[in-house]
Each structure stands twice: as structure tokens, then as C-alpha cells.
């Protein structure tokens, strides 16, 4: 990880400026999105605008700067209700909430950008990969952070070794 860039994907000028200032960027890891299912049901426009429009802005800037690789943080919410278990990549995608639909829409957009511009994508469809509680007793704000993926990203940004502060708790395998 060469650079962690904080910004707002809803501002295309910020993306353009960032890519202009960093011409050696050859790939993007895209984790920026709203991700609360319950909130997405109450305020779907917020999720569609942020998750879809923000990604379109990013893809357009990537196209303009010749960046043709992206890792996209999608979600298992694109699958909807399981038709079989365990769920695999070939499982039908039928989201049941705006959050899942916003992520699936972005996946379809990425298919179109691949066909039109050659932007290759890898999509990560997480299943509460770091131990989130299905009863929502564990939220997204932890002090100290207890989820694996945020700890790995923090370590990458700080260029330190990632640690697991909850060694006694099991992580869900995926």
C-alpha cells in the first residue's frame, strides 16, 4: 500500500486532483461507502447517491488517468436471502435492501466499465468477515477496534504490524 488518500468521492475535482498529484497510481482499492443496512432502508437516496455516484466519479477519473485496476469492497448483502448454503460466488444476487442494491448496481457498472474501458475489477463480498453480531449488539464503532479488516487497514496506513486485540474471540471464516 503506497498511499492512503482520504477524500470525498462525491467531489470529482478532489479525485482528479488526487490522481493528478499521484501519477504513479496504477490501481485503486475502493472501500468508501455507507454500509448500515437499517439506515439504507430509512434513507435509500443517501446510499444510492453516495455508493453509486461516488463510485461513478471514481471510475470516470480512473478512465481519464488510464488506471485500469480496482479492488471493490462489495457485500454479501448483494445475495439477499440465501437459496442454499454455503453461499458461493455463483449464488443468485437478489438484494433485499438499498445498501445491497447499491453495491450490486456498482458491480454491474464495473462490468460495463470493463467492456467499455478495460477497467478490471475484483469484488470482495464480505459476510461480516470480522465477527459482526447478527443481533446488532456489536456496532461499527469500537474503541478499541475489534474487527480484523479495520485493524489491517490501520496497520497499513501506519506501516506497523497488524494485531488482533480480540485473540480470545473467534473470527468467522470465509
Region spans (language model):
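Conserved Rossmann-fold cofactor-binding substructure of NAD(P)-dependent oxidoreductases
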Residues: 2-27
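Alpha-helical elements of Rossmann-like donor-binding domains used by nucleotide-donor carbohydrate transfer enzymes
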Residues: 14-17, 27, 57, 108-109, ...
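Conserved NAD(P)H cofactor-binding loop of Rossmann-fold oxidoreductase domains
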Residues: 31-35, 74-75
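A conserved pocket-lining segment of Rossmann-fold NAD(P)-dependent short-chain dehydrogenase/reductase
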Residues: 40, 127-174
Amino acid at each position: 500500500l503506497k498511499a492512503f488518500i482520504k477524500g470525498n468521492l462525491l467531489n470529482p475535482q478532489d479525485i482528479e486532483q488526487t490522481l493528478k498529484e499521484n501519477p504513479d497510481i496504477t490501481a485503486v482499492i475502493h472501500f468508501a461507502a455507507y454500509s448500515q443496512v437499517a439506515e439504507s432502508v430509512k434513507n435509500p437516496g443517501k446510499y444510492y447517491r453516495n455508493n453509486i455516484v461516488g463510485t461513478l466519479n471514481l471510475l470516470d477519473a480512473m478512465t481519464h488517468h488510464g488506471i485500469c485496476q480496482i479492488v471493490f469492497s462489495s457485500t454479501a448483502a448483494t445475495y439477499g436471502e440465501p437459496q442454499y448454503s454455503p453461499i458461493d460466488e455463483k449464488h443468485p444476487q437478489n438484494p433485499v435492501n438499498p445498501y445491497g442494491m447499491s453495491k450490486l448496481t456498482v458491480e454491474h457498472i464495473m462490468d460495463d466499465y470493463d467492456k467499455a474501458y478495460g477497467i478490471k475489477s475484483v469484488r470482495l463480498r464480505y459476510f461480516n468477515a470480522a465477527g459482526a453480531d447478527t443481533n446488532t449488539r456489536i456496532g461499527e464503532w469500537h474503541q478499541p477496534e475489534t474487527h480484523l479488516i479495520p485493524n489491517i487497514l490501520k496497520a497499513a496506513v501506519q506501516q506497523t504490524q497488524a494485531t488482533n486485540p480480540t485473540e480470545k474471540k473467534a473470527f468467522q471464516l470465509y
